[in-house]
């Protein structure tokens, strides 16, 4: 990435002096003094957590009193609210019920109710295949999941060669799964078109969102992006679509040598391979654990270099091509083709999450600088677009 190595907090200030040609011309918003992410839990949320655990888990959970249940917020979610629910030590287990679970409450539902049903089915299938946490309960507002002793990876750990290779292998195995969902790759542009229409239909009070749409000519730009990707070969596989550090758990008590687990499948679908890899590379830049407004940091210089991308690609292809014998020339061509594929689909990642964040700004109750983040993603889009020498002649 063509940027200096200093940390950039947030994106440019919406409505300020902007340039869509790169990040360096953008003005970052002034941090809001002493504004930190809240970790408090409302009494109503505590009560509802108790009711769901009691009803869906049964056993010892029915014997514990509401005030005895430990409900602690889990940081890291930008789409949902997460809580760790635990039984008190003095309440004995009665059977095979878990003693602690993860409660996921849906945030602003942008995908539609049908997508939530499909996600729950997907979650259950992956759990049965030991590829994800167990599912303990599903209800309209969210679900109860297995709490895994683990921690999410940190943004800077994505650059670690050993971890990067392991993530590539994990992604390749995910891509090789057969799932009972439509194989037509409509998810990417279908979702972006819906997001854009929802943004355009926002009330007139949502002026900052309208400014972003007009500033970047997003409708026309989406058509340009579609033309580029239509001319970019990329296999359709079952994609996670959100492999960022917060969705990769480092297990404390793994059942095998494989100590990484992918979680959060709400955006998973059959999609183009290039999007999943390009999206992961974009996430090398963003740290969502920043504790002050806008609650993320962007470091453009951390976008993976050519060599870092090749390391990932080689581990990915090694898993996909198990048993195949390729000449050195064939292998090199595959690597070069994949570099081009990824660089183009990385644009789609910026565009997708830029639209997503613009819409979240008008709906979400999660403390996060959604508009600042949207602007950062769109600026990255235009910067990386300008670096694609073959953009106009794919």
Swiss-Prot record:
- Return the Gene3D superfamilies for the record: 3.90.1200.10, Phosphorylase Kinase, domain 1
Identify the metabolic or biological route this protein is part of.
Answer: Phospholipid metabolism; phosphatidylethanolamine biosynthesis; phosphatidylethanolamine from ethanolamine: step 1/3
Q: Which keywords, in A-to-Z order, does the entry hold? A: Acetylation, ATP-binding, Kinase, Lipid biosynthesis, Lipid metabolism, Nucleotide-binding, Phospholipid biosynthesis, Phospholipid metabolism, Transferase
Instruction: Report which superkingdom the organism of origin falls in.
Output: Eukaryota
Q: What is its EC number?
A: 2.7.1.32, 2.7.1.82
Please list the residues that bind ATP.
Answer: 75-81, 104, 146-152, 244, 264
The residues that hold substrate are: 77-79
- Please give the residue ranges the record annotates as the region Disordered: 22-42
Residues of the signal peptide? none
Q: Which is one GO molecular function term here?
A: choline kinase activity
Gene Ontology, cellular component aspect: cytoplasm
Q: Which reaction does it catalyse?
A: choline + ATP = phosphocholine + ADP + H(+); ethanolamine + ATP = phosphoethanolamine + ADP + H(+)
Which residues carry the post-translational modification N-acetylalanine, per the record? 2
Keyword Translocase present in the record's keywords: the answer is no
One Pfam family cited in the UniProt record for this chain:
Choline_kinase
Q: Name one GO biological process term.
A: phosphatidylethanolamine biosynthetic process
Please give the family membership noted in the entry.
Answer: Belongs to the choline/ethanolamine kinase family.
Subunit structure, interactors included:
Homodimer, and heterodimer with CHKA.
> What does the UniProt record say this protein does?
Has a key role in phospholipid metabolism, and catalyzes the first step of phosphatidylethanolamine and phosphatidylcholine biosynthesis.
PANTHER family this protein is in?
CHOLINE/ETHANOALAMINE KINASE, CHOLINE_ETHANOLAMINE KINASE
State what protein this is by name: Choline/ethanolamine kinase
Q: Which organism is it from?
A: Rattus norvegicus
């Amino acid at each position: 990435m063509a940027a200096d190595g200093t940390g950039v907090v947030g994106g440019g200030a919406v409505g300020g002096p902007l340039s869509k040609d790169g990040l360096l011309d953008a003005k970052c918003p002034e941090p809001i003094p002493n504004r930190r992410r809240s970790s408090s839990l409302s009494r109503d949320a505590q009560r509802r957590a108790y009711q769901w655990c009691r009803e869906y888990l049964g056993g010892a959970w029915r014997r514990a009193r509401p005030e005895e249940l430990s409900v602690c917020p889990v940081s890291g979610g930008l789409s949902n609210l997460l809580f760790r629910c635990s039984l008190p030590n003095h309440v004995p287990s009665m059977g095979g019920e878990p003693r602690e679970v993860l409660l996921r409450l849906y945030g602003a539902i942008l995908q539609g109710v049908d997508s939530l049903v499909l996600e729950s089915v997907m979650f259950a299938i992956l759990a049965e295949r030991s590829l994800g946490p167990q599912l303990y309960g599903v209800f309209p507002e969210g679900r109860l999941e297995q709490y895994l002793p683990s921690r999410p990876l940190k943004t800077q750990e994505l650059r670690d060669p050993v971890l990067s290779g392991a993530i590539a292998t994990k992604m390749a195995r995910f891509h090789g799964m057969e799932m009972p969902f439509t194989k037509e790759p409509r998810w990417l542009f279908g979702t972006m078109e819906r997001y854009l229409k929802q943004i355009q239909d926002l009330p007139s009070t949502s002026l900052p969102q309208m400014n972003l749409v007009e500033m970047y000519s997003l409708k026309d730009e989406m058509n340009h992006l579609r033309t580029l990707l239509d001319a970019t070969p990329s296999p359709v596989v079952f994609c996670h679509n959100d492999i960022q550090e917060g969705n990769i758990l480092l297990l404390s008590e793994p059942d095998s040598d494989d100590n990484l687990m992918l979680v959060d499948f709400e955006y998973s679908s059959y999609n183009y391979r290039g999007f999943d890899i390009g999206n992961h590379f974009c996430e090398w830049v963003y740290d969502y654990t920043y504790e002050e407004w806008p609650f993320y940091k962007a470091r453009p210089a951390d976008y993976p270099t050519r060599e870092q991308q090749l390391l990932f690609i080689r581990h990915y292809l090694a898993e996909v091509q198990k048993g195949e014998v390729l000449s050195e020339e064939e292998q090199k061509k595959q690597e070069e083709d994949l570099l081009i594929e990824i660089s183009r689909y990385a644009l789609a990642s910026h565009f997708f999450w830029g639209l997503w964040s613009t819409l979240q700004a008008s709906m979400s109750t999660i403390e996060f600088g959604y508009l600042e983040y949207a602007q950062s993603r769109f600026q990255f889009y235009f910067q990386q677009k300008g670096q694609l020498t073959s953009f106009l002649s794919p």
